[in-house]
Amino acid sequence: MKKLIIRWQRLLDNNKTCPRCRKTEKEIEKAYKKLKEVFSPIGIEVVLDKREMSMDVFKTNPLVSNQIWIMDKPIEEWLNANSGKSRCCDVCDDEECRTIELSGKTYESIPEALIIKACLLAAADLISPKLLNVPRGTLKIF
């Protein structure tokens, strides 16, 4: 079975994280569950790799917190988006944290729809004609 790997890292200091990372975590979990269900029948296993950053690591480069990679490429590359930054909160020591800029909109937390879209684009690279030979009605699209 081929693997579609989603890697996400965020600041976690004494079990505390910022609101935007907390929201992204909820969104990535929803996307992960849907993607697992959709890709399993065509032989693609979805793997979610969550990583924690200490405050010391965060302080060296706050813009790598709340970052998602899909198949070792930043989500921004899949979506043709840009990364940005904006002031966050006291958990982050008021650092400027990562945002995504896409089609004139800035996202402080990453919505489920963008995660799914990027994963669909990545999955297209994994799909071979043989994988598409599934019985009609097997795939349930969300």
Region roles according to the model:
Residues M1-V46, S54, F58-L63, Q67-M71, ...:
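Non-globular targeting/processing and membrane-anchoring segments
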Residues D49:
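Acidic/histidine-rich catalytic cores of soluble enzymes
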